[in-house]
C-alpha cells in the first residue's frame, strides 16, 4: 500500500469515527430529553392532590355500598402511589444507565415502556379522582333529586286524599302503596344522611319509579271504577227493566238464557271488583269491555224484537189485502181462460197453472188466518214471525209474478191473432202488387226461381188465412205459419228486386256494347251469348255477368258506373 493510499484510509476512518461520535451524541441527547420529560410527567402525576381528595371522602364516614366503593378506589390509589411510581423510578434509572453507556436501542425501548406506564397511571388516576368526586357529590345530588320526588309524592297523596271516593275498591291498595313509598323515603334519608349516598341513590331510583307507576294507576282507576260501579250496572238495570216490560207485553225471545245472562253479568261485576282492589287494571279494563259487549248483545236482542213487532204488525195488516188482491186476479185469469177457450185451442197448462195458484193461495190464506188469530196471545218471538211472514210475502210475490206471466201470455194470444190477420191481408196485397210490378217490366220471361217463391208464398199465405178461419183457432199453429209466410214474403221481395235489377242492367249493357261490337269480336260473341241467355233462359243474372265481364276488359269500371246509376234511380215496389 502506498503512502497516499494509507493517508486516504486514515482520513476515511477518522471521518467515520467523527460521524459515529456525532450520531451517538445526538441519540444520547434525544433520549436525555425524553427521560427529562417523563421525569417531569411522573412528578406532575405524583404531586396531584389525590391524597387530599381521598382524605376528604374518608372524613365523610361513608358506610354500606358507598364505603365499599371508596375502599376499592382508595386501595387502587395506594397501589399506584407505592408500587407503580416506584417501578417508574427504577425504570427511569435503568434507562439513564443504558443511555450513558451508549446502549441507545435498549434505552429507547425502556423509554417506550415508561411512556406506556405513565399513560396507564394517568388514566387510573383520572378514574380514581372522578370516582372520589362522584362519591363526594352523591349526597348533595341525592338531596336535589329527593326534593323533586317529594313534590311528586305529596301531589299524589293530595289527589288521592281529595278524591278518595273515585277509587272504590282500589283505595286500600293505593294507600298501602303510598305508605310503602313513604317508607322508602325514610330508608333513603337514613342511608343518605348516615354515609351511604350510593345505596341511597338506588333507593331513590326505585322510589321515583314507584311514584310514577302509582301515578299512572291513580290516573286510570277512576274511569274504570265509574264504568264498573255505575255505568255498567245502570245499563244492566235498564235492560232488566226493559226486559220485564217486554215480557209483560207478551214478547217472546228465541234466546232462552236471558235471565241467566243477567245473573252472569252481576257475578262478573263482583269478580271484576277484585281486579280493581288488587290494581290489576288491564284485567279490569278487559272484563269491563267484555261486560259491555254482552250488554250490547242483549240490547240488540231486545231492539231486534221491538223492530220485528212493528214489521209483523205491518205485514199482518197488509198481507190479507195483498192475498185478496191476488185471489181476485186469479179469478180474472180463470174468466179470461174460459172466454178464450171459446175461440182458441189453449194448452192445458194454462188452466192447470191457474188451479195450482188457487190451491197455493188457499194454503197461504189459512197460514195468515192462523197467525192473525194468535196475535192476541203470541207464542213465538216476533223475529221468528217476521221471518215467516216475510217468507210468506216473498212466496206471494213469486205467485203474483206467475199471475202476471200467465196474464201476459193470455193477452198475447189475442194480440197474435190480430197481428196474424193484419199480416195475412198485407201479404195478399203484396202478392198482387209484386205480380203487377213484374208484369210492368215487360220481361221476355219469368225465372223459375221467382215462380217457385211466388207460389210458395201464396200457398203459405192461404194456409195462414185457413188457420185463422178455423172455428177453434190454434194460435201456436197460426204463429208458426205466420213466421213461414213472413220469411217467404221477404225472400220473394228480395228475388223480385234482383230479377228486375239484373234484367234492366243487362239491357243497358247490351245497348252500350254496340259501340264495341263492330270491331271487337270478343264483345260481339259475349253479346250474342248474353242475349241468348236473356231471351231464352230468362237467367238475367247470368246474362248480366256474361256481358259485364266482356265490357270490363274493354272499359274497366263501366259496370260499377251503370250499377251506381241504377241504384240511385231504382223504382221501389209500392205496397
UniProtKB/Swiss-Prot annotation:
Record flagged with keyword Acetylation: no
A Pfam entry, by short name: EzrA
Q: Which InterPro entries match?
A: EzrA
Q: What is this protein called?
A: Septation ring formation regulator EzrA
Q: Which residues fall in a coiled-coil region?
A: 105-191, 265-301, 354-416, 456-526
This protein's gene is called ezrA
Chief site of localization: membrane
TM stretches of this protein: 9-27
Q: Please provide the record's keywords in A-Z order.
A: Cell cycle, Cell division, Cell membrane, Coiled coil, Membrane, Septation, Transmembrane, Transmembrane helix
Function summary: Negative regulator of FtsZ ring formation; modulates the frequency and position of FtsZ ring formation. Inhibits FtsZ ring formation at polar sites. Interacts either with FtsZ or with one of its binding partners to promote depolymerization.
Biological process, per Gene Ontology: division septum assembly; septin ring assembly
Q: Which GO terms describe its cellular component?
A: plasma membrane; septin ring
What the record says about family reads: Belongs to the EzrA family.
Localization of this protein: Cell membrane
Keyword Cell membrane in record: yes
Where, in residue ranges, is this chain on the Cytoplasmic side? 28-575
Q: Where is the signal peptide?
A: none
What spans does the record annotate as topological domain Extracellular, numbered to this chain? 1-8
Please give, as recorded in its UniProt entry, the membrane topology of this protein: Single-pass membrane protein
